[in-house]
Curated annotation (Swiss-Prot):
InterPro entries: ARFGAP/RecO, DNA_rep/recomb_RecO_N, NA-bd_OB-fold, RecO, RecO_C. Belongs to the RecO family. This is DNA repair protein RecO. GO terms for biological process: DNA recombination; double-strand break repair. Pfam families: RecO_C, RecO_N. Keywords: DNA damage, DNA recombination, DNA repair. The lineage of its organism: Bacteria, Pseudomonadati, Bacteroidota, Flavobacteriia, Flavobacteriales. Involved in DNA repair and RecF pathway recombination. GO terms for cellular component: bacterial nucleoid. It comes from the Bacteria. The keyword DNA damage applies.
Length: 239
């Protein structure tokens, strides 16, 4: 079936001497994988390798067969050209980390329009802002809403957060209950917009600890989830 849709690049892997295998999250069909023949050698072809950098936003025309098969792109053009996302060194490190997180966390091969629009808006915001130190934390916390394990927000005044059940409670009931600074930060982040992130003050230690807590939360709720290899680079940059 010929599909016209928006897509966000998750990863691009070199295959052989000149081909790319590209994973993209599409508005029409969720996660899709494309084979791009000869893109790394052709100078006059309609596709350029730079179009498939992580988190690039595209409009594409593709043949979608479904069933987990490799799809084929017919046309692609970059939309919402980023001004700094792929050139600012700190943002580039964050792009690597977030793309790897998405690759490890998203399994859907079906349309999820709210998730697509969340990704689309988030990366446009990251491109436009210079207040980025805590962006990845709120991004990952909000992402849980679309993946089905958002923290329960009804009772936020309780002192303990149960990572296993995703709820606040007044006592520890298992080995995955946390309290203290990370719970206070979690309450601050919940309901916060990206443009208010600058008002959440964190130092190196608290930022790294909170991220470690989020990654554990992902591990508990996504079977087979792996921590990103780029995590150490991100921690070093924000250290």
């Amino acid at each position: 079936m010929l599909i016209h849709t928006k897509a966000i690049i998750i990863s691009a892997l070199k295959y052989g001497e000149a081909d790319l295998i590209v994973k993209a999250y599409t508005l029409s069909d969720g996660l899709c994988t494309y084979m791009l023949k000869g893109v790394l050698k052709s100078r006059k072809g309609k596709f350029k390798a730079s179009m498939f950098q992580s988190l690039t936003q595209l409009e594409i025309v593709a043949n979608h067969r479904g069933g987990g098969k490799m799809e084929y792109l017919k046309e692609a053009k970059v939309t919402g050209n980023y001004q700094s996302l792929h050139t600012h060194p700190i943002k580039l490190a964050m792009v690597m980390f977030l793309a790897e997180m998405l690759r490890n966390a998203i399994r859907e091969e079906e349309s999820n329009e709210p998730l697509f629009h969340y990704l689309e808006y988030s990366f446009q915001f990251l491109d436009s802002t210079d207040k980025i130190a805590n962006f990845h934390l709120l991004f990952l916390l909000n992402l849980t809403r679309y993946l089905g394990f958002q923290p329960e927000m009804g009772i936020k005044d309780l002192p303990v957060f149960n990572l296993l059940d995703g709820i606040f409670q007044d006592f520890s009931s298992n080995d995955y209950c946390i309290e203290g600074k990370n719970v206070d930060l979690l309450k601050s982040f919940l309901g916060t917009d990206f443009d208010a992130l600058q008002y959440i003050k964190m130092n190196q230690t608290s930022r790294n600890d909170f991220l470690s807590m989020l990654l554990l939360y992902y591990e508990l709720h996504i079977e087979g989830f792996r921590k990103p290899k780029s995590l150490s680079v991100l921690n070093e940059i924000f250290g």
